[in-house]
Amino acid sequence: MQTLTDYGWNEHFAAGLAALNKPQLVAARVLADYGSMLKLATPELKNAELSGALVHAAAPADLPKVGDWVAVQMFETESAVIEAVLPRRSDIARKAKGSKTLKQVMATNVDVAFVLQALNDDFNAARLQRYLYQLSLSHVRPVVVLNKADQAVDDIDHYISQVEPLNVEYIVCSALYGDGADEILRAIAPGETAVLLGSSGVGKSTLTNALLGSDIQKVGAVRERDQKGRHTTSHRELFSLVGGGMLIDTPGIRELQLWGDEEDLDETFEDVFALAAQCKYTNCKHGSSESGCAIQAALKSTELDIAHYRNFLKMSSELKVLKTRINPQNNRHKKKSNKRFLDD
């Protein structure tokens, strides 16, 4: 039988439980979210519902998610009631789908995130940078997994050349044949929690099965015409790995809408900010007609990739809009950093 320590319990969460000062509550980790019911890791596996007080008091992003540690009221039956969510060490978020401006948490208390990119026409460096930005806000270590290497034997170097400038760890693998699975497992230390992120059809379920050594996750087909996949993972679930780590599999993400602040783009686009600091004038707008602009000079010399810079401008613009929607007052109080970048 696994203990709470096996699921990642540590002093951080113990302090959160003690702060509640409710000795009748016990700790548990959320293993799966089935909508109206959550599966918990307790001394015995239990299903749980949320208390009415928690449902009405918490914002949607603060309700229990897969990976969360929670305080639970246990009963003699198979069920339990979640009374509180313990303070998180990390959360990976995006803007929720739809017209409302809401934060959606995809996974919590994660140490390392594997961002899967398929080595086919679905590969997208701009999309990858969106993931890296969100992970930088979460303080989660990113590892890019270049999957389906068996389909791109002659083109692997081409894809690697697009990842290397991002200064991120990467692993080339073929989940279908298990190639690279051992390297991925070595990247998850005992007690650490990892999550698989990526679009539908990139092979997350196949990789989950390879890492677990069994066909636990359903695997779906990919459309030939565009290499797009259908959702085969319908819910988020946390699994225990043989080496002592844990793995969260997630449904495919069709669109990663950003959630954050434009001023935090400096980590993902360190090169752009470094060039901006070299401009002749401190009030440089980095437009094509600016004199002494280091960014324009780098674009002309191809030192700075135009697609990379355009993606920076797109993400910066998207985050500005998000900021004004979260709080319209922010529109009058923008910081000067990214205000200097023109959209050209």
PLM regions with names:
Residues 1-125:
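N-terminal accessory targeting/assembly segments
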Residues 204-220:
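A conserved segment at the C-terminal end of the G1
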Residues 2-4, 24, 59-76, 87-106, ...:
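Helix-rich effector regions associated with P-loop NTPase G domains
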Residues 123, 152-153, 179, 254-256:
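Catalytic P-loop NTPase motifs of RecA-like helicase/translocase cores
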